């Protein structure tokens, strides 16, 4: 069995073995994920292999394992727009290669402090795509340099590339396939097979954690997979 196949099976098993009846004081488990939830009242449900999230404020959902070497992350995601209170067509975002310069190899050391507040992620080194950000007006790629936090704010997260055309903004209730690849000292970001972003990396700069980043919206997330390429 390949590592990527194992991750897919683990994802499904974590959901399938959840109890069908949940007492009022109990919550289903997010399994291999850590939530940093600004609101404290983020709601999620798990149906078969799909995670549904209703997010009142900022939320980062970190995959617990730190990824190293050459790898590909892939998943499907949909912005739900059915008239709900938090159904907002904006911010289908993600982090990858995330690290905390003050706590090398221990990204979750300041998880409670970050608490889903977007500015607090300026303390990290990472790669970031904000797809359909600014109320679905922009799709942007940035690289964060957390070492400049409280030193030089203008150098923390330079913009690498941006789209503003409708073809590269969000559509309601549409499923998207996301592929993030780190390989041969380069990273790429693809949506439905189209490469939107590419960036050369220094050796080891692609190592770190993946995080799904959401803001005041309602999403469905499934088919999460990690494939090690080396």
Language-model-derived ranges and their functions:
Residues 25-230:
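Extracellular glycan-recognition regions
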Residues 1-26:
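Bacterial Sec-dependent N-terminal signal peptides
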């Amino acid at each position: 069995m390949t590592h990527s196949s194992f991750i897919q099976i683990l994802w499904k098993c974590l959901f399938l073995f959840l109890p069908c009846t949940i007492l009022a004081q109990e919550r289903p488990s997010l399994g291999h994920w850590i939530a940093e939830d600004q609101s404290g009242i983020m709601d999620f449900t798990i149906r078969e292999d799909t995670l549904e999230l209703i997010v009142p404020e900022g939320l980062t959902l970190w995959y617990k394992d730190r990824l190293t070497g050459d790898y590909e992350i892939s998943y499907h995601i949909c912005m739900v727009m059915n008239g709900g209170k938090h159904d907002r067509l904006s911010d289908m975002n993600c982090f990858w290669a995330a690290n905390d310069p003050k706590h090398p190899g221990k990204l979750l050391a300041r998880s409670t402090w970050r608490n889903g507040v977007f500015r607090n992620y300026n303390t990290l080194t990472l790669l970031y795509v904000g797809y359909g950000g600014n109320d679905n007006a922009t799709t942007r790629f940035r690289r964060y340099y957390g070492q400049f936090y409280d030193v030089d704010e203008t150098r923390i997260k330079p913009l690498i590339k941006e789209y503003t055309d409708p073809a590269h903004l969000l559509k309601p209730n549409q499923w998207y396939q996301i592929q993030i690849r780190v390989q041969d000292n380069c990273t790429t970001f693809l949506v439905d097979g189209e490469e939107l972003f590419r960036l050369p990396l220094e050796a080891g700069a692609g190592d770190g954690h993946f995080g799904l980043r959401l803001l005041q919206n309602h999403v469905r997330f499934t088919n999460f997979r990690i494939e090690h390429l080396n």
